[in-house]
From Swiss-Prot:
This is NADH-ubiquinone oxidoreductase chain 1. Core subunit of the mitochondrial membrane respiratory chain NADH dehydrogenase (Complex I) that is believed to belong to the minimal assembly required for catalysis. Complex I functions in the transfer of electrons from NADH to the respiratory chain. The immediate electron acceptor for the enzyme is believed to be ubiquinone. Belongs to the complex I subunit 1 family. It is a multi-pass membrane protein. GO terms for molecular function: NADH dehydrogenase (ubiquinone) activity. InterPro entries: NADH_UbQ_OxRdtase_su1/FPO, NADH_UbQ_OxRdtase_su1_CS. It catalyses: a ubiquinone + NADH + 5 H(+)(in) = a ubiquinol + NAD(+) + 4 H(+)(out). The keyword Oxidoreductase does not apply. It is found in: Mitochondrion inner membrane. The gene is mt:ND1.
Amino acid sequence: MDYLLSLIGSLLLVICVMVGVAFLTLLERKVLGYIQIRKGPNKVGFMGLLQPFSDAVKLFTKEQTYPLLSNYIFYYFSPIFSLFLSLLIWMSMPYLIKLYSFNLGVLFFLCITSLGVYTVMVAGWSSNSNYALLGGLRAVAQTISYEVSLALILLSFIFLIGNYNFLNFFMYQKYMWFIVFCFPLGLVWFASCLAETNRTPFDFAEGESELVSGFNVEYSSGGFALIFLAEYSSILFMSMLFSVIFLGSDIYSILFFFKLTIISFFFIWVRGTLPRFRYDKLMYLAWKSFLPMSLNYLFFFIGVKIFILSMLF
């Protein structure tokens, strides 16, 4: 019975994430519209509320094309696997009951984000297009570089908390949010999340000016829609994780969803305001700026933990 309830809970979560992704795309188009001093989509339904659903119908009813020289099986399955991974990562969502919230949630998150690299790489390689391959290689290098900083930031909090469970982040932030005394770390985390999810200003995998459309250049209709869904699902997850780790929000309060919306809005706001970074500067930022900073904070947290333990015993 418990297994059945957990299964139903996770299916409901996946459906809600999908609906959230639909409205996140609408929010993005609206916000970008107002940033560029124009209206966003406002024709379909009331104020364009049904626009994402008409987009979905359009994308999934289009003809599925594939390049003759592509490695068809890999080409076909990499978007599906990509979406599967970005939905699987939601299983580590810190709920107390009826979901798979487990003690090693942080480790699970790191494992799944590492696996996400392969889908992009395989999608780029199997298309058998130079543009797609270059985009895939860029995405892999970028994701691996920024994952180091993400892992170190998480590790520093784990040293402080002494547990891999996301639920413990709530308990430790009952009186003060981590963002208060780790503001620089919060900014590093946010920038790393932008790089992880291939968003502006780090969207080199999809650099239109250089690579046509990057690793998804050969994808159309359903395949493109699945890659798109995976990207926006991971944006929502990263926003959720930011509010859990730094803003200490209890997942059962309405404030948690408000914070999640604000962080998602920041993702869109950055896209509307910042130009694309230069690739060498991106790598410079990852290895010479973010890595030393997260290492310094790691040692700082180890020192704090040792100090607390020495005071106790």
